[in-house]
UniProtKB/Swiss-Prot annotation:
Residue numbers binding Mg(2+) 1: E126, E155
Residues reported to bind Mg(2+) 2: E155, D176, L178
Cell location: Plastid, Chloroplast stroma
Further facts: In plants there are two FBPase isozymes: one in the cytosol and the other in the chloroplast.
InterPro entries: FBPase_C_dom, FBPase_class-1, FBPase_N, FBPtase, Fructose_bisphosphatase_AS
Gene (UniProt): FBP
Name recorded for this polypeptide: Fructose-1,6-bisphosphatase, chloroplastic
Length: 407
């Protein structure tokens, strides 16, 4: 029961006696009549009045003002505005479908025995998790079936892969299908990262009828060169975080938008628009287990963060070990995320093409900054698909501060 008016009236959305009341009516009971007649186990007729449901519903609509915008409808709006074309809408929709499938796989990983390693090593020399392999297949298949993707490059593939001619489109999509998969067994946040580059007809290989291999060979190196574009050429980028909720964060070069997966309807719903990162923050996110491997300037920077600042408090350390999870927190609350070069990984550990560049595109659209410590990440020209670079990303003031230490 819920109070309807100040005169102590009670509205029942379900009548106690469906056989006696029209299903298209709401019954309003006078509270005093109900209470005084409760001992007789029935309600006096004088305490009941009915009104049509349609009338009450229209009043509710006027009061609520709720409007749900799904990712699909939002993309169509951007298409109507001329910001993106129909082809890109289809590619982004196929990526969102892949993310829904991966989200389901991640949530059921322990139940479906999908935790642990696959028993293989990827091009990075890393042990592949079972879900690394499956997520890569899911992502690749969704992009192929879209009919709008020409070339895809993945963390789990040695080289760029051309989509079969019968399904081939033009867009170039780079992605990390499951970032942070080493945390999967512990049910820690993971995610998928992607970037989309503009089409180039010259890049599409011409397969002969006798070709049964769609992996680019030496004769199609021009396609690999075309995939290796600087992040400044990105048309769209985003990530999907699989955590207590599933968040799909997207930019098409006109701000950053956050969509949350509604498990009831299976749709991504717009929950934040034109997200802006704070200009500064008091959270730093570095893996300090590598502290002894860092150069002295970086050590000095980290040491200074631990001293009381203008607020009288030192910075807080937060580190999940998942780029998507750590970046998402930084995007919301401000601060800095860093994965520097060290004595073991002289070029850094994160991949430029499908990790650093997409994230830097997102953070810049949110008013932040992405740097390798000396230059803007989006200005770096990749020389190979799996090229690694150091990364410092987050609030503009925080990134500029670390750049001064490293200069």
């Amino acid at each position: 029961m819920a109070a309807a008016t100040a005169s102590s009236q009670l509205i029942f959305s379900k009548p106690y006696s469906p056989s006696r009341l029209c299903p298209f009516q709401l019954c309003v009971f006078d509270a005093k009549s109900v209470l005084s007649s409760s001992r007789r186990k029935h309600v006096n007729g004088s305490g009941v009045r009915c009104m049509a449901v349609k009338e009450a519903t229209s009043e509710t609509k006027k009061r609520s003002g709720y409007e749900i915008i799904t990712l699909t409808s939002w993309l169509l709006q951007q298409e109507q505005k001329g910001i993106i074309d129909a082809e890109l809408t289809i590619v982004l929709s196929s990526i969102s479908m892949a993310c829904k499938q991966i989200a389901s796989l991640v949530q059921r990983a322990n139940i479906s025995n999908l935790t642990g390693t696959q028993g293989a090593v990827n091009i990075q020399g890393e042990d592949q998790k079972k879900l690394d392999v499956i997520s890569n297949e899911v992502f690749s298949n969704c992009l192929r079936s879209s009919g709008r993707t020409g070339i895809i490059a993945s963390e789990e593939e040695d080289v760029a892969v051309a989509v079969e001619e019968s399904y081939s489109g033009n867009y170039i999509v780079v992605f990390d299908p499951l970032d942070g998969s080493s945390n999967l067994d512990a049910a820690v946040s993971t995610g998928s990262i992607f970037g989309i580059y503009s089409p180039n007809d010259e890049c599409l290989p011409d397969f002969g009828d006798d070709s049964d291999d769609n992996t680019l060979g030496t004769e199609e190196q021009r396609c690999i060169v075309n995939v290796c574009q600087p992040g400044s050429n990105l048309l769209a980028a985003g990530y999907c975080m699989y955590s207590s909720s599933v968040a799909f964060v997207l930019t098409i070069g006109k701000g950053v938008f956050v969509f949350t997966l509604d498990p009831l309807y299976g749709e991504f719903v717009l929950t934040q628009e034109n997200l802006q990162i704070p200009k500064s923050g008091e959270i730093y996110s570095f893996n300090e287990g590598n502290y002894k491997l860092w150069d002295e300037n970086l050590k000095k920077y980290i040491d200074d963060l631990k001293e009381p600042g203008p607020s009288g408090k030192p910075y807080s350390a937060r580190y999940i070990g998942s780029l998507v999870g750590d970046f998402h927190r930084t995007l919301l609350y401000g601060g800095i995320y860093g994965y520097p070069r060290d004595k073991k990984s002289k070029n850094g550990k994160l991949r430029l093409l499908y990790e650093c560049a997409p994230m830097s595109f997102i953070v810049e659209q949110a008013g932040g900054k992405g740097s390798d410590g000396h230059q803007r990440v989006l200005d770096i020209q990749p020389t190979e698909i799996h090229q690694r670079v150091p990364l410092y990303i987050g609030s503009t003031e925080e990134v500029e501060k670390v750049e001064k230490y490293l200069a």
